Amino acid sequence: MKHATRTRKARPRSSLAAFGPGVQAAFPSERNTSHFLIVLAVGLGGAALAGEAYAGCNGNATQTIGQVDYGYTWSACWGDSGVDDKDEKNGDPGASITINTQASYTAGASLPYTMPWDSVGGVIMTYTMGGAGVDEGTAGAGGAVTITNYGPITLTTSTDPGSIGSLISATSFGGSGDGDNDNYKSNGGAGGSGGSLTITNYGALSVESLSPNTARGMAGIHAVSKGGTGGNQNSGAAGDQFGGVGGSGGSISITNTGQVNLGSATNPLNGLDYVWGLAAESIGQAGGHDNGAGGAGGAIQIHNGSSGGNASIGAINIYSNSADSARGIYAFSQGSYGTASQDSSDDGGAGADGGQFSIDTYSDIAVVTTGSDPNELSGGIVAISQGGDGGAGTASTTGGRGGNGSAFGSTLSVQSGVTVSTKGDYVAGVVGLAQGGRGGDGASGEKDSSGGRGGDVGAIQINVYGGSIETDGIQAYGLLGGSIGGQGGNGGDDTAVVGTSGGGGFGGNAGGVGAYVTTGSKITTTGDFSAAVTLHSIGGGGGTGGDFTDVLGGGAGNGGNGGNGNTATINNAGGTISTSGGHSYGILVQSIGGSGGTGGIAEGLTLELGGDGGEGGSAGAASVQNTGAITTDGYSAHGILAQSISGGGGAAGTAGGILSIGGTGGNANYAGNAEVQSSGAISTGGDAAIGILAQSIGGGGGSGGGAKGIATVGGSGGAGGYGTYASVWLNGGSIATRGEMAHGIMAQSIGGGGGNGGSVIDMSVGIPALGVGGSATGGGSGGWVCVTNENSGGDCSTGSGAPQAVAIATAGAGAARAADRDADVGAD
């Protein structure tokens, strides 16, 4: 153990300290040097000595700037690190920063500050970081940042310093816990949280041109709140300690009524990593070693434009050439991962939750990409909440649970009179996604170490209140909403004299996904695989059971159950939806249960039991209400497709030994209802383009595990899932299809097939052998199918080429084949 001294642990110094105590925090532009403001640095940061831990700011933490011409404004602050003393091990928080400026900014070619290495920099740049903790001490939080800008900010090639990545940058980082904790039997210190960020912009933000630099991106406003890494526990071998919890990202709020122009139609920004209009990232950091839980992502709120009805106020225009991603508005809340356990008394660290987001635009957004296609998700509005993955387990412990995605639900809204338009392949209109983190895997080579559960997910809601969404490109969705449960972790494989291996973790449950489109709204896509509205609620798949190899007997791990899908529903209350392109549906809503995990394989000399397959997850209702007009023109471009599909059961694991029993295949689950109510006009123009297609489909049962040995029993197959109600109600309106095999209405309820029984192979040398093949299990039944025309004014017409006005089917799947005993293998 260290003695209590007053020395500080060294931490890196920023080169900002080189400016000394008199820092020109608001730098006059070259075009007007008659107005300037000198702001003295406060605290000790400006005069820090080499190798000394320090605190303070370079540039005043509070600045008020009038109507002058400037080049740059900045403030960077650090909290003091803890010291190696029992009462002073905690890091201090970073200072809060407030900038209120009415200046007009034209950036200078020479950057008057040196950026912290973990900042994107900006014409207005703020940075605050908490101090590091010592031993088990808690790291300091990043300070809060408030920026209010009233003036224009302009950046051109001639004034580009070549390094900054935004016009307005706000960064708050929590300090990190101690990675070298030598206080005996102590837990790791928690990482500091990122501070809250509030940015209000009234000024025009313009990047007219830039020097190409693929090592950076460019954003109009870029706000990042990030937690610090949790500190390491002293030792996983002695006592029962935990790694420090990772710091959470802070909340972020951006309000913008200034125009944001990045590039132009004649001069797009070229060769950048990314081009984003308004960007907010709240990111938790990892827990410390061992088994530290991750830090959560914070809530994000972005309000763009004014509710006064002028959609040009706060308009965002993005012109990008060959960037990895292009986004008008971008929100990302990431829960971090838990760390692996090396301590047999504790599970792997839990993954943390992603935060909720709320995005609202009253102003137009245009994103145009040229050159090579984006490598990352791009669109007019892109919002993502991601749970962190769980850490791996160790001997007789379980992998950490995956974090939840958007645990409290998230919304995106496009207001009346607003147009969100994109041009380019793989550039969507409005995207809202939430995903649970993956459960941690069990440790291989360790006894009975199971996978962790996947994270659950909250609801996603997308609203279009009289606005327009327009996309032009391949796989350029109009609206895309998804809630996806996390995958269960895999069970650890093991080799031992006797015992069992770990089971797979359960998949996480999905949240509901909804869309509401009002009268006056328009959603238009041009290009193949570009559905106007796509909504997915998908349960996470179960993890795979671990394999087991032994001498005296043992069993493999069971597969984890799949997570449940939730409701996927849209109310098109008078909106106009049109697509032009193959497989570009008008509306696609899907609820899908996660598949069960595969059982593990058991191999040995005596009694062996194959792992059972996991059960499939259930599916929720897939529901469409339509009173608007839907038009498609392309091959297999259905007007409305509603599907509820339950997860299939996992296949069972095989067994090999003198006495061997294959695992039982997992049962599939129930599908939900697939329901469509329409009183609007639906028209399709392509071949195989059905007007309305509603399907409720049960998943298939998992196959039973095979067995190999002298006395063998194959595993039974799992039962198929049931289809439930598939219904279409026409309350007036019309359906017209013109292509071949383009039915007006098709409704189906189909049960899933039962799983095959496991086969057996009897291997004997000079002795009789006994083998029993596994039994098959029955398939699921189909449910009710109902098509109703409640209004005699309704009409359904089809073109030539064997289409039917109405096609309905309900079918139960048959049982799968029971396995036969294979011929003996051996010699008398």
Model feature map: region roles:
Residues 1-31:
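N-terminal secretory signal peptides that target proteins for export/translocation
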Residues 77, 139, 172-174, 179-185, ...:
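Structural boundary/hinge residues at secondary-structure and domain interfaces
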Residues 51-61:
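Cleaved targeting-peptide boundary
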